[in-house]
Amino acid sequence: MVFGPGLLSVQFMNIISTTGKQRARQLLFIMGALLIATHEVCPSLAEERREKIGLVLAGGGALGMAHVGVLKVLEENRVPIAYVAGTSMGSIIGAAFATGQRVDAMEQLLIESNWDEIFSDSVNRDELSYRSKAGRNREIYGDTKISVKNGKLITPFGVVQGQRLLPVLQRLYENGPPSPADFNEFRIPLRVVAADIETGQAVVVSKGDVATAVRASMSVPGVFAPVEIDGRLLVDGGITNNLPMDVVREMGADRLIVVELNADLQKRDSLSSPLAIGGQIISILLAQNSAIQKKTLTKEDILIEPNLTGYTAVDFGKAKELIALGEEAARRLIPQLKHLSVSEAEYAKFKAAREATIKQTTVEFVTIHCDKHGSKEFLDKVVTTKPGDILDRNALDEEVERIYNTGDY
């Protein structure tokens, strides 16, 4: 039985004209009817009124591994996240969370990965042809100019192209929808922040291939080659908006959980590689623009700042320690986080939906583009993946690695 507002008003008017036990009985009846009406008309009222919590993950190179520790604490305390935005390393972790990667799987990947190899474009010289070896020698001993050829940016030796990084990112996001995708359709809506190297403007990526978007967001100028998306040449978003609080608010968040990363600057004797110098530049720039964003914090927002003293943006080999520091910082704020907790049943539903395994992906087509330096016959032989096959990412990665190691592609 459902009582509308008009009927309830009539019943209350009738109470005025009654007395004694009759009034009491009628009042109890109307109160019960009101409870039934509320339950039947608005069965999910509590859920609808729940605040939408946005998660903001700052950039900071290796320091961003601390984000995983924060995610562990958010899960333990049943804090449902409605929106995610990240910059640079924050976008790597944020995209993994938004596309359904398990937090423990993220932790394992970060700890077990060989980051020196991932950040290297070196190839196995034993597999190079004589011509490719000669070309590699010319790259090493000369030709350090930046130029444009056939409309593409040609970068000098020493700039990481990210050949080995992209497969790692794709594996992190394999539980998400096929690319290209609308990032609003992810398990948790996502935004990836990069910067346009030509204009200096922040670029918020909300669609396309998520691995490519993240690869752009972490392209430290002078270290990683820029990434072209929609005609714009994109680099690390940390130079324009390292703490994208404004982006998450625009997505619809009522309150924010903000994870800031404060990096120690390195001394001169430690600045001995392009990666170290690039990390130093980003650390300086991100500190400046993060301060601007933090001025917009409200009393409803929660700011988590891991104590990262002694660690730098290039400490990728210290994943375990950095994750622990993020976890420690979040645990200090559990009293505040508890206010955002939902019931065990509700969080279990949220977690199950976020981590739901996607169906197997079927290959629809395979297209191979070969320039004048490559061999179409060789590529046809190496690439065994065919239309109609169930995608085997391990096999595909091996095929790509073999092709890359020839030095011709």
Where do the protein language model's features map onto the residues?
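Bacterial N-terminal signal peptides that target proteins for export
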Residues: 8-28
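C-terminal segment of classical bacterial N-terminal signal peptides
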Residues: 35-43
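Patatin-like phospholipase
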Residues: 42-87, 95-407
